[in-house]
Amino acid sequence: MTSLPASQAWLYVRNNSSFLVKRNGVQFSREPGNLTQLNTYKSSGLCNDKAIDINLDEDGKIVMALKAPKRATKPSKSLNKTPLRKNFRRSAKAIQSQTAGKFYRGDLTGKALARYAALHRFTKVQQGLAKKAKTKTGRRGAVGDDDEGMPSLT
């Protein structure tokens, strides 16, 4: 099976895509592999052979997915997903080594790091909001907690 050339695929996808979102005269794209979320040929994850996607999974964890050019004819198997569970610096270094080490476009590394930083900041805020504040319901022996006004049993 032969694959469609990237430029021809873009002609089909650019105006008609299930990932396309048009708001206030600007076209956005929610497709996997599109780091900038703009509907352009350069940032399209569907049309390019090598693409990077950094997103949250169902559990709220950050996952990096790399599109493998070897599996271009099998879209369901073309993404290699890697969870980014380490601290910020190690995960950023993993993103750099995966993109630069496998000869992805140079501009994708900076965009991937920017997206990872934004998602990392978002998850930290979400973790902070998820914690409930501890409230003390009452203490024994606190001031005003003696049994005034109660009849004595003795």
What are these model-derived regions, one by one?
Residues 1-154:
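Compact, Lys/Arg-rich rRNA/RNP-binding cores from ribosome-related proteins
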